[in-house]
């Protein structure tokens, strides 16, 4: 029997706010354990939570970017469970009335576009963290670090529309790109800023009844998500075919083995005994707030890619690379605003600029060559002042010295030679020294032409105008 996977993803997005969702404690990552806490996030008796307005704004931004309906009224709820890293004994979340509902994202896998529904986006606080290692002052064992407790999260819940690990990764990558573009999350998966719970079940092909699902918790890389889902699909099919039954449970992914393992029985919603939090009034969001937020959104990757193709004539590949990050797209567009040709700017940003950034271990936001300076370099190429080859040398000097390209060209005497008399003299000397290759060319071996071009460029130290060289060489070689 053939089986079909059914996958739904719950993505936890840690919001890039300076302070926590219900108190004023810092959200800075990496501080010493329990140094960023207060009575509110420690769950002390008598304290009251105060909602961080920035968290609501970020939630609205996420909802609009994922085509959700923004609820005019939403409610915070207490999710009750006991765990050492949850000091209050409950988590403040949203349940029946979340802030965002009924959205979608379109993904592309193997050239096919598919729409993945988004059930809801809700705000909640993160729990603390258990540290299983040598604890300073306590020796080996387990410690509880509550710095992360009360850190703001969005939980983005997809419909069970995903049918393969590849589709799951495509959806996750797109969602990751969007939240980073919006500036609401740093996207750092290693630090847990963007992590995923994967709900997986299998059913016979053609069936409309979903199988029993498992939930694999807190997978924090695209590669691990793919491995975890593929293993879970394989495990469930094998179990069913051997006559066993899939148990509804929570599982963990082990990156060392590439397998999932049982963690605990999977709870149902009623196990958490949700009820409205009496310490937080219902959240009312005006239409004006939503529309003001909509106007403040940056142009998102899909819209940018479409514009680059239709208005700038760029290829699908170029548009994809240039919109990979918001910073890359803005650097490219700043080049255009300074007067750079679209294709030339695209080639240089994807080529020399990216190469230099990778070698230096920098992000494009740290690029020492400003867009206006890169544009000035491209304009020197367009005018014929320097060749593309010389331009790369000039760029390297710009990277190191922060000098204008015009100054470097003048200082180093790099102006392109277009004087036909000077170029003809070089060609004549090279032909006289390589008569064997001249005869080969005239005998029909046209590949030799590249040899002569290389010799002329070498003799001119790269300064000869390639177009003039090609024209004069062809004329002289043909005799």
Swiss-Prot record:
Keywords: ATP-binding, Ligase, Nucleotide-binding, Protein biosynthesis
EC number: 6.3.5.-
Enzyme class: ligase
GO biological process, one term: translation
Oligomeric form and interacting partners: Heterotrimer of A, B and C subunits.
Main function: Allows the formation of correctly charged Asn-tRNA(Asn) or Gln-tRNA(Gln) through the transamidation of misacylated Asp-tRNA(Asn) or Glu-tRNA(Gln) in organisms which lack either or both of asparaginyl-tRNA or glutaminyl-tRNA synthetases. The reaction takes place in the presence of glutamine and ATP through an activated phospho-Asp-tRNA(Asn) or phospho-Glu-tRNA(Gln).
Similarity annotation: Belongs to the GatB/GatE family. GatB subfamily.
Identification of the protein by name: Aspartyl/glutamyl-tRNA(Asn/Gln) amidotransferase subunit B
